[in-house]
UniProtKB/Swiss-Prot annotation:
One Pfam family linked to the record: ABC_tran
Keyword Transport on entry: yes
EC number: 7.6.2.5
Organism in which the protein naturally occurs: Anaplasma marginale (strain St. Maries)
Family to which the UniProt record says this protein belongs: Belongs to the ABC transporter superfamily. CcmA exporter (TC 3.A.1.107) family.
Protein name: Cytochrome c biogenesis ATP-binding export protein CcmA
Gene name per UniProt: ccmA
GO cellular component, one term: plasma membrane
Compartment(s) where it occurs, according to its Swiss-Prot or TrEMBL record: Cell inner membrane
One MF term in the entry's GO annotations: ATP hydrolysis activity
Occurrences of domain ABC transporter (ranges): 2-208
Length: 208
């Protein structure tokens, strides 16, 4: 179980949201929705421990993710902007992720699922935005963690790829995984998802 308790986040001197709480249980999909600039990405990056919350806590199975390396190893994050290095080939990227997790045996399965075999020798920077997205999402399968956190999972994907990723996410949840997604609005792809709405804030600047 992943639990966000009274989380507040700040960007610069602007309070994005405050006292946000929700629980994401195993076997569930949580969809974080909100307007552009509302703080969806900031919340996801806080959940995975990349940036600190201004206040509140994020816990996985009762352990604070900011101090537990065991928690971080159970989470895979795929951001809206890919973290892939442009000069690396697709094969090199998959091997790097697998090396980080000790999951080299999963490279072929990820490449097969996302149809990456024809582009394994292509440098990431030379791919279209749609193929770059497929490569970025393949990290979910290579890393094989219990918690998936994905920012705008369907951006830049064609309809066939959207269906592929939808099935992947549903299957992960059915098998007991925790899936947290962010998008601009609710969609019909995950009708049973828990919705976490980030409301507009009128709090303005933050003072200490």
């Amino acid at each position: 179980m992943l639990e966000c308790s009274d989380v507040s986040c700040i960007r610069g001197d602007r309070l994005l949201f405050e006292n946000l709480s929700f629980v994401a249980k195993g076997g569930s999909i949580t969809l974080v929705v909100g307007n552009n600039g509302s703080g969806k990405t900031t919340l996801l990056r806080t959940i995975v421990g990349l940036i600190p919350a201004a206040s509140g806590s994020v816990r996985l199975d009762g352990e604070d993710i900011t101090i537990s390396s065991k928690c971080i190893l159970q989470i895979t994050y795929v951001g809206h902007k890919s973290a892939c290095t442009g000069n690396m080939t697709v094969q090199e990227i998959l091997e790097f992720w697998a090396q980080c997790r000790g999951t080299g045996e999963l490279i072929d399965a990820a490449a097969c699922f996302f149809g990456l075999y024809p582009i394994l020798d292509v440098r990431f920077k030379n791919l279209s935005s749609g193929w770059q997205k497929r490569v970025a999402l393949s990290r979910l399968l290579v890393s094989n963690t219990r918690v998936w956190v994905v920012d705008e999972p369907f951006s830049n994907l064609d309809p066939d790829a959207v269906a592929l990723v939808q099935n992947l996410i549903l299957t992960r949840a059915e098998r007991g995984g925790i899936v947290i997604l962010a998008d601009h609005k609710k969609n019909d792809l995950f009708t049973d998802a828990q919705i976490v709405q980030i409301p507009p804030t009128d709090c303005g600047t933050h003072s200490t």
